[in-house]
Amino acid sequence: MLFFVLAGLCEIGGGYLVWLALREGKSLWLALIGVVILGLYGAVPTLQPTHFGRAYAAYGGVFVALSVLWGWLVDRIRPDKFDLLGGWIVLLGVLVIMYAPRG
């Protein structure tokens, strides 16, 4: 799970820096830094001990939950009950995908 969180922070953080530069008129240096961080996002999931499809499917759930949290903590947009419920549902899906017993 640590690698999923790290990948999520790279993807969301890098994307956010690009967003700030292109949508909010901040320095283009932020976009450049964001692109580098997005490149790290592409590498981090390779550290997962499972195959590509499972790793990215599970990561998608972590991304959703982290995005809600990022919006709350960074953008100061308080999630409503449906945002929170959806975040918990996708995290439950992550646990099923990654840790369900397989034979």
Swiss-Prot record:
Subcellular location: Cell inner membrane
Cellular component, GO, one term: plasma membrane
Assigned keywords, A-Z: Cell inner membrane, Cell membrane, Membrane, Transmembrane, Transmembrane helix
Protein topology in the membrane: Multi-pass membrane protein
Tree of life domain: Bacteria
Transmembrane spans: 2-22, 27-47, 55-75, 81-101
Cross-referenced Pfam families: UPF0060 (PF02694)
HAMAP family in alphabetical order: UPF0060
Family: Belongs to the UPF0060 family.
Entry protein name: UPF0060 membrane protein Ava_2216
The organism of origin for this protein: Trichormus variabilis (strain ATCC 29413 / PCC 7937) (Anabaena variabilis)
